[in-house]
């Protein structure tokens, strides 16, 4: 999984810093800026990251790439002969870089060096003092308030407040009986209890394979911080479940997708969550990799809208028909047929998948629902194309913070104004570019790995505060076993419980 990464623990500068307009421009290692959570020992993420902003000798920030490999980055543990860390430097093409590194063992006093032509950049070297734990190290911080501060989590999250407002009190005893009776036969559910920072589960329904995503984030959280004792039900299906119009006797169900006609409690999607947990692991598409693969600059992008996907909604059929009528405006095609009969005369041939990064060769990205919300929206936003988003009853955990005409161009749910909106974007190129930039900034600032961990913890913490009785390890529950520790690189947790914590 990480063999290639481990062979190259730093990148050498081989490309000179050139002017953005063609002439020579001097990059200043002293004036360039470095910041981010990956420089804090206590911020444990699957892949830690920080930023570099290139600045010239006049104090002006670069706004385009000074060269892909101008910075040398090395991560090492001075007390160790070999540091088991994978490092990547990602050029965001706007004068800034993301440096991300995944640790496969825990170390003391980790040293992070950033150099330009042999000179240290900003305040390099950075020393992460004390123990620095890797993702698989089971060493939770007992003080959750301290963890929230280190992670720079927000005090409140509006979507969590909205979702939990339906439930002034939660009785674990009651829901443990009623939810399986109401939903357990027809739906796929997981009944979880977190007790003493251990995770227990009982599944309901036939298709419960997606529990792996929920198991993974819960275990990851318990390795990092003392979780509140909490008992909850997670919906593994696509559609939200709690559709009662009245608030009387509704049940709290946690889902990856919400809707305006349901009262489910929304979590970050399994797709986005998995991309965070597996960054620099088994996934290649994540919120950081997209930022280094945004295609040509805006002025050089193809001026057609692009879409690929399967036939999981009627409006997608209409989109492909529109594309066939207006190929100069829209490049939309199906990669798979499953829900509807494939009529090649109407919808054209099935095409091969293209790399997600190739979407960003186009200025305009169409985001249209599948069975529920299209879970690709975070990745589309963090690119540098403008998103045309279909109006929808479905939403992910962050949709309500997005503003139409600021972060994306809205399109009616039946796509009746899609051509009009595309023509507007073509006629208002600078405004469309500004919307693309605002959407990208929103995603950069709100949908990174630390944001996802904060959301989950705050959600479970605030939900736990609503409980009117103690969560229990119910009959039939089994412990979700933690990941087996690597015997070659064992993790020694240096956090000792005080008497007050015992």
UniProtKB/Swiss-Prot annotation:
N-terminal signal peptide = 1-19
Q: Which GO terms describe its cellular component?
A: cytosol; endomembrane system; endoplasmic reticulum lumen; nucleoplasm
Name one matching Pfam family.
Answer: Glyco_transf_90
**Motif Prevents secretion from ER in this chain:** 499-502
Top EC category: transferase
Sugar attachment sites are 302, 414
| PROSITE patterns for the chain | ER_TARGET, FILAMIN_REPEAT
**Localization, UniProt:** Endoplasmic reticulum lumen
Spell out the reaction equation it catalyses. L-seryl-[EGF-like domain protein] + UDP-alpha-D-glucose = 3-O-(beta-D-glucosyl)-L-seryl-[EGF-like domain protein] + UDP + H(+); L-seryl-[EGF-like domain protein] + UDP-alpha-D-xylose = 3-O-(beta-D-xylosyl)-L-seryl-[EGF-like domain protein] + UDP + H(+)
| Pathway connected to this protein | Protein modification; protein glycosylation
Record function comment = Protein glucosyltransferase that catalyzes the transfer of glucose from UDP-glucose to a serine residue within the consensus sequence peptide C-X-N-T-X-G-S-F-X-C. Can also catalyze the transfer of xylose from UDP-xylose but less efficiently. Specifically targets extracellular EGF repeats of proteins such as NOTCH1, NOTCH3, FBN1, FBN2 and LTBP1. May regulate the transport of NOTCH1 and NOTCH3 to the plasma membrane and thereby the Notch signaling pathway.
What is stated as this protein's family in its record?
Belongs to the KDELC family.
Q: Please state what the protein is called.
A: Protein O-glucosyltransferase 2
Question: Native species of this protein?
Answer: Homo sapiens (Human)
Gene name as annotated: POGLUT2
